[in-house]
Amino acid sequence: MSEVERTTTIPDEIAILPLLGTVAYPQTIMPLAIGQPESIRLIDDLMAGQRIVGLMALKNEDERPNPVLPEDFYQLGSAAVVHKLMKLPDGTLRAAMQVLERIEIVEIIQTEPYYRAKIRVMPDALAESEQLEVTALMRSIGTIASQIAPLIPQFPTELLNSVLSEEDPRRLAYLVASYARMSVTDRQAVLAEPSIKQKLLKLNEVLTRELNVLQIGQQIQSQVQDEMSKTQREYVLREQLKAIRKELGENNEQEVEVDRLAEQIEAAGMSAEAHQQAMRELDRLRQMPTAAAEYSVIRGYLETLIALPWQKRSDDTIDVAQATEVLDADHYGLDEIKERILDYLAVRELRRKRSPERDPGRGAILCFVGPPGVGKTSLGRSIAKAMNREFVRLSLGGVHDEAEIRGHRRTYIGAMPGSLIQAIRRSGVNNPVVLLDEIDKLSSDHRGDPTSAMLEVLDPAQNTNFRDHYLDVAWDLSPVMFIATANTLQTIPAPLRDRLEIIQLGSYTMREKYEIASRYLVPEQREQHSLAPNEVEIDHEALLVAIEEYTREAGVRNLEQQIGTLMRKAARQVALGSATPIVLDPAKTREYLGKRRYFSEIHERTDRPGIVTGLVWTPVGGDIIFIEATKMTGRGNFALSGQLGDVMKESARAALSWVRAEGEAYGIDPNFAQHYDLHVHVPAGAQPKDGPSAGIAMATALVSLLTGRVLRDDVAMTGEITLRGKVLPIGGVREKVLAAHRAGIRTIILPQRNLADLDEIPADVLAEVQFHGVEHVGQVIELALRAEASEAPVSVPESAVMPNLFQSDVEVLVH
């Protein structure tokens, strides 16, 4: 203990000086650079009175808070006395502090112009029973220090001698802690430990770890030196060879090109396998005349290898709050979709932070499924933006050759890498977000099945060693984030679908289309057509006209085209010098867009018996269909037309059988088939149709036809029928309901068990549409058909004999 330490008494109240990036240990001399105005004021006041100050480490070791608050520094530190002080010309101070003892803050009693606090002294503890262990730890620290010293260039000999000769365990602990490589948090932990034995134990661990790091570093350095010696030898020999050739006049462009490729190969950061392959091909290139056909093939191959981003990657730190802002800014609505995406991103970020040994990409692969124009591709772009990654789109529509994914072997003329490797090359990084667009449009032929190649690409257990046929070296795809899009799941093979996490995107409501148009489409189209906001304005009613009268789609792609047409017309007026702003009202909108394209057909098409409005699902969204039934003089034949599939034909047969069995209860003559043929037609005959969901609509159409009762013009229905008249649940409820709402239908009949699906319907649609859940087709008839008949029901003479044309085999005519 020094003379200063023996004679200095630490008062109960002292000033507090926060330290940035270091911790003050007792029984040491600590140099300080003091530049903060409040700290300079503190030191000046100290020199005028008591020279003792409390040194407390700031918790943030990288940046000093401004202002410094009590919670910004540790409450346990050390008391020190100013030993030496020097003022510099720039006004800052250099001080040498004699650190005395550990102290702890009891209470802050002053905050301005600097902190003062009540403190209590916290002396270190050393039990007699721990003396042997402490002695052993001191010797261990000395041994480790002796091993570390030769591994660190210019290691101070005086420091090693001090460590080896120090007999005071407390002084040794603080001496070693002062020079050891530790973070502020670890340094503070050493200071906070009351037991000297525990301090020495922790320092023993720190020194052992540092020794291991230094030894491994020395081994690596030795290996690098050996490699450098070999490389330098080759370099010297090549330089000598070039000099000899230059003297002989044999220097040519080929050598220059080969040397350039060699330098680029070394700088590319390739994997060991790729580097070995590249050098092998480069040696072949050296020996090959430039006129050889294979020369350009090898050169192209090497340039492709060099251009790949072997070591370049984006910093993909995910901020979930920022991701939320990006998704909300780029897309209106889609709340459930956004929630699922944010959950996915949060899991990736937690896995990256808490389980770095696990590949963060080994999670689910998102697949957005929905109609065209609902934002699948733009969602993928927003995810890349939220993750700070490069985005690249890979269109798979119409791909039917496996080589388009895996690449062509170099034995073929014009061989190229597969589209996946080319996409990564275009992105410039090895961890882009790759959007596999239209994955449901993959097909196969005699050249292979690209779906099989996609299985390897999307499987985390296999894609770490993806081997493109052209490259013929392994490429790690695990850093790549894949997102797929599709219009339907029906054409995606089951093994591929199992690797995807499906997120369904439904149709937009009228309100959502209006919001998307006003927030995104109108400003974007205005900018694309070089129009200023004060030159063209579209009012509320005009947008509704464009949506309701000129588009009928699940997404907004066609709506964007119509808005683009309006902007082109407005741009023409501006170019002609018309007064601005040009206000697009409903009248101008209709003038610019031409004749109306879509009308509400419900009342017009359901004003006679035998016509029913049904609901269908298609890969491009929901739609309404009109099922038409008619009768004619005949002998009981039953015809179907409209390109109906087998399932839909069976639904029609089931509907007819139920009508024949139960029709008398609804006033239908049981012998109607003696003099009449029936024909059920589903318009839009060029479009194939199938599925069981039109069963109740067909039964209702037949009952309407045979009873003369007309369907209510605001009703549509969907549901499967059984021979007993039971109504079974169906799928695609959301798309069908939105299609009905777009068409102006305000009453929808659904199977009872499908009412649970209404929670997927937007609230504004639910408020405008009345839903009826049914379990039997009889309920459908009572809800859908008007009570009075507009035509006389079908009747036949009582003496007529019923032919058996409906008895067993029904003749189905498909026109």
From Swiss-Prot:
EC number of this enzyme: 3.4.21.53
Molecular functions (GO terms): ATP binding; ATP hydrolysis activity; ATP-dependent peptidase activity; sequence-specific DNA binding; serine-type endopeptidase activity
Q: Which ranges carry the Lon N-terminal domain?
A: 14-211
Q: Which InterPro entries match?
A: AAA+_ATPase (IPR003593), ATPase_AAA_core (IPR003959), Lon_bac (IPR027543), Lon_bac/euk-typ (IPR004815), Lon_lid (IPR054594), Lon_proteolytic (IPR008269), Lon_Prtase (IPR027065), Lon_prtase_N (IPR003111)
Q: What induces it?
A: By heat shock.
* Keywords annotated in UniProt: ATP-binding, Cytoplasm, Hydrolase, Nucleotide-binding, Protease, Serine protease, Stress response
User: Family, per the entry?
Assistant: Belongs to the peptidase S16 family.
Annotated positions binding ATP: 370-377
Top-rank EC class of the record's enzyme: hydrolase
Q: Which residues form the Lon proteolytic domain?
A: 606-787
Q: How is the quaternary structure described?
A: Homohexamer. Organized in a ring with a central cavity.
- Spell out the SMART domains in the cross-references: AAA, LON
| Active site per the UniProt annotation | 693, 736
Q: What is the name listed in the Swiss-Prot or TrEMBL entry for this protein?
A: Lon protease 1
Which N-terminal residues, if any, form the signal peptide? none
Gene name tied to this protein: lon1
Compartments, as annotated in UniProt: Cytoplasm
